[in-house]
A protein has these predicted regions:
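Donor nucleotide-sugar binding/catalytic pocket of nucleotide-sugar-dependent glycosyltransferases
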Residues: 51-90
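C-terminal alpha-helical cap of glycosyltransferases
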Residues: 260-273
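Aromatic "clamp/platform" in nucleotide-sugar-dependent glycosyltransferases that forms part
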Residues: 183
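Conserved acidic donor-binding segment of nucleotide-sugar-dependent glycosyltransferases
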Residues: 215-216, 220-227, 236-241, 256
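Nucleotide-activated donor-binding/catalytic signature segment of Leloir-type glycosyltransferases, i.e.
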Residues: 145-163
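Conserved donor-binding/catalytic core segment of Leloir-type glycosyltransferases
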Residues: 93-124, 132-135
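Short hydrophobic beta-strand element within catalytic cores of glycosyltransferases
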Residues: 200-203
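Glycosyltransferase donor-sugar binding loop
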Residues: 104, 131-145, 161-162
Length: 273
């Protein structure tokens, strides 16, 4: 039984599923999605041990999560990265005459949505032609707060709401920089997808991001909640296209290893064990 496991309320759902599997004598495999799961290990050590120590295997989709769990004494963690079907993400070479920012995530407090709007405002203040598209569903009221914040800062943001995978991939053709503003993260599929599409990524330096993106080689990582550092990184990408193209090529090469045709062999090994 595969159990998607997150750090929020879903953690308790995962706990109940794991205990039911134990009663029914079924092997279960938690898939460790939440970038804030290490804090959950600290806050709920007993429940965590009941879930993870008894698991057939725990799947860490990032080296960050695997290292964090091993730091708490969990040795039955296997690294299998989040996957994409690479054929669905056509690589596109972009130009950077103007800045067109793309943000893709659910509108949740932990993803610090307002920072993206602040970045756009700061770019406008510096007389840099820039646009921002924010793709994702409402989760905890953050979408409405973001719309209100955009009005307060007098900036125009394209809020699309939730889009299908194909729809946002198609829309991404009109944008040239991907920003990730989160305060907590693991190994987000949206970042992998952006790297596959040829979008240079500027992200906060949190959670699993340094394990996914080597700073200055495959994208740019900055401190969280610092709009000025994002703007500096964005303008750096614009001013140095050759260096930007080098990072884009490195990023694409890395995520080619996350293609399902490659990763599925690891899954088959776990599920047949």
């Amino acid at each position: 039984v595969l159990i998607d496991t997150y750090s929020t309320f879903n953690f308790y759902f995962a706990y109940l599923c794991s205990q039911l599997c134990r009663i029914l004598k079924l092997k279960y495999v938690p898939i460790l999605h939440g970038g804030n799961l290490p804090n959950r290990l600290k806050k709920n050590p007993k429940l965590s041990k009941d879930i993870f120590n008894k698991a057939h295997k725990n799947i860490g989709p990032s080296l960050y999560i695997m290292a964090s769990f091993k730091g708490f004494g969990y040795d039955n963690v296997v690294y299998i990265p989040n996957t994409i079907e690479l054929k669905n993400y056509p690589f596109q070479k972009r130009t950077f005459d103007n800045i067109h920012l793309l943000w893709v995530r659910s509108f949740s407090k932990i993803y610090n949505t307002n920072l993206a709007i602040e970045i756009l405002s700061l770019l406008n203040e510096k007389n840099t032609d820039a646009t921002l598209c924010m793709v994702g569903p409402e989760n905890d009221g953050s979408l409405q707060k973001a719309k209100k914040y955009a009005k307060e800062l007098n900036v125009e943001v394209n809020f699309t709401g939730k889009l299908s995978k194909q729809a946002w991939v198609t829309r991404s053709q009109d944008y040239n920089i991907f920003i990730n503003t989160t305060n907590f993260d693991n190994m987000p599929v949206s970042i992998i997808e952006a790297m596959a599409l040829g979008l240079p990524v500027v992200s906060t330096h949190v959670g699993g991001m340094p394990f996914l993106i080597e700073n200055g080689e495959e994208g740019i990582l900055v401190a969280p909640n610092q709009a000025d550092l994002f703007v500096k990184a964005i303008k750096q990408l614009q001013a140095n296209p050759d260096e930007t193209y080098r990072m884009i090529a490195n990023a694409r090469k890395k995520v080619e290893m996350f293609d399902w045709e490659i990763v599925k062999k690891q899954w088959f090994g776990i599920l047949s064990g």
